[in-house]
Amino acid sequence: MSKGQVIQVMGPVVDVKFEGGNLPEIYNALVIEYKSDAEEAPTSQLTLEVAIQLGDDVVRTIAMASTDGVQRGMEVIDTGSPITVPVGTVTLGRVFNVLGNTIDLDEPLPSDIKRNKIHREAPTFDQLATTTEILETGIKVVDLLAPYLKGGKIGLFGGAGVGKTVLIQELIHNIAQEHGGISVFAGVGERTREGNDLYFEMKDSGVIEKTAMVFGQMNEPPGARMRVALTGLTIAEYFRDEEHQDVLLFIDNIFRFTQAGSEVSALLGRMPSAVGYQPTLATEMGQLQERITSTNVGSVTSIQAIYVPADDYTDPAPATTFAHLDATTNLERKLTEQGIYPAVDPLASTSRALSPDIVGEEHYAVATEVQRLLQRYKELQDIIAILGMDELSDEDKQSVSRARRVQFFLSQNFHVAEQFTGQKGSYVPVKETVKGFKDLLAGKYDHIPEDAFRSVGRIEDVLEKAKDMGVEV
């Protein structure tokens, strides 16, 4: 292992000189061990990642933690490889930082644990799956109108308090219970409080045992925030490639990954590109997204929360992300105000998988008819607000009546929210979802009151609820 010396510290950027031409490779992890001035203080270890070879035996590195206490002249050791993180079943139920160190104050991991490098190549063409397969989530509105592809990338849009976290938890629960699948949650540059809340909520709802969590929050240096998504992805890839699992990878928030890359780029002295972003924006995003895919042995399906700066969808950060997405799930505050959960907007949410070739003719026909009906209802709402229902034609009255039933039937109770709602959660297979909506559109249930459709799973549950309301079914 070659050794060098710190010759310059500029915030999170550290320059290191190696004598004798033994320069570390780009992306190699370097380690500085030092003690602070306090006598009782333990030895601190700082990991650096090589970003540029400057010449004259000097490399410029990015720190993965605070550089407080680092001084010129300190010894730096080249580990000889990129950052490595723990992988395998021991990661489940645990919380890690960007370096793969546990931060949940639980038992330390065994020393002989398998570790993988965070910088890896995307799967080659011959390793990729050639079939297109739907990932059944058990959530009606998602499965019917914006289905997820195995190995696909889904963008999750929504403001504060509209149910992003609950939707994420339910997806983790359903994948674990129905598919025996693993989930990895990567908190990238978001609030520490939210990560803490999510951890305890997942503990309470019982899904933590099938989940590995990785955090690089917004108080950490840009190096940690930029690399933590790769740490989460590396853990997910192991379950796909070695355990042959279908893995869900949640990234919250993908915009912060880009933002951290922009900060690092500026610190390294690169010329900025459009709107001040790094010139390598598309390359960095592509390197991350291309590793998220289906292979012959398993899949990594990614659900990425996306913050849109100033609601400008043409901003280079979200625009670059959109190029990689297969589906979008939009959460709408107006639906939460009506008590419709999950508050997924059925008209704004889209999916590349919603085509007759992938989901089948019947599913496609039912989904497009549901969207047409809801679009007509939306167009009529202004007329209803001004003139009332009586001014509508009989055909439009029927459309509105059915659309309201459809809208309520798109809601359902979640397993992870049972402790708050007192209502049992439901998982609805795609076949039953399609059949239920097909019968509903055909007018089979026009006599059932609207309220019977609210927050239920299968169509049988609607009929059961209607009976309890004293309606003949």
Curated annotation (Swiss-Prot):
Molecular functions per Gene Ontology: ATP binding; ATP hydrolysis activity; proton-transporting ATP synthase activity, rotational mechanism
Cellular localisation:
Cell membrane
The reaction(s) annotated as catalysed by this protein in its Swiss-Prot or TrEMBL entry are: ATP + H2O + 4 H(+)(in) = ADP + phosphate + 5 H(+)(out)
Keyword vocabulary terms for this entry: ATP synthesis, ATP-binding, Cell membrane, CF(1), Hydrogen ion transport, Ion transport, Membrane, Nucleotide-binding, Translocase, Transport
The UniProt record lists the EC number as 7.1.2.2
Disulphide bonds annotated for this chain are none
Q: Which SUPFAM superfamilies did the record assign? A: C-terminal domain of alpha and beta subunits of F1 ATP synthase, N-terminal domain of alpha and beta subunits of F1 ATP synthase, P-loop containing nucleoside triphosphate hydrolases
Its main subcellular localisation, reduced to a broad class, is membrane
| Signal peptide range in chain numbering | none
Q: Which residues bind ATP?
A: 158-165
Its membrane topology, per UniProt?
Answer: Peripheral membrane protein
Cellular component, GO annotation = plasma membrane; proton-transporting ATP synthase complex
Q: Which NCBIfam families match?
A: atpD
Described by its record, this protein's role is as follows: Produces ATP from ADP in the presence of a proton gradient across the membrane. The catalytic sites are hosted primarily by the beta subunits.
Q: According to its UniProt record, which protein family does this protein belong to?
A: Belongs to the ATPase alpha/beta chains family.
> Tell me, how does this one assemble?
F-type ATPases have 2 components, CF(1) - the catalytic core - and CF(0) - the membrane proton channel. CF(1) has five subunits: alpha(3), beta(3), gamma(1), delta(1), epsilon(1). CF(0) has three main subunits: a(1), b(2) and c(9-12). The alpha and beta chains form an alternating ring which encloses part of the gamma chain. CF(1) is attached to CF(0) by a central stalk formed by the gamma and epsilon chains, while a peripheral stalk is formed by the delta and b chains.
Q: What is this protein called?
A: ATP synthase subunit beta 2
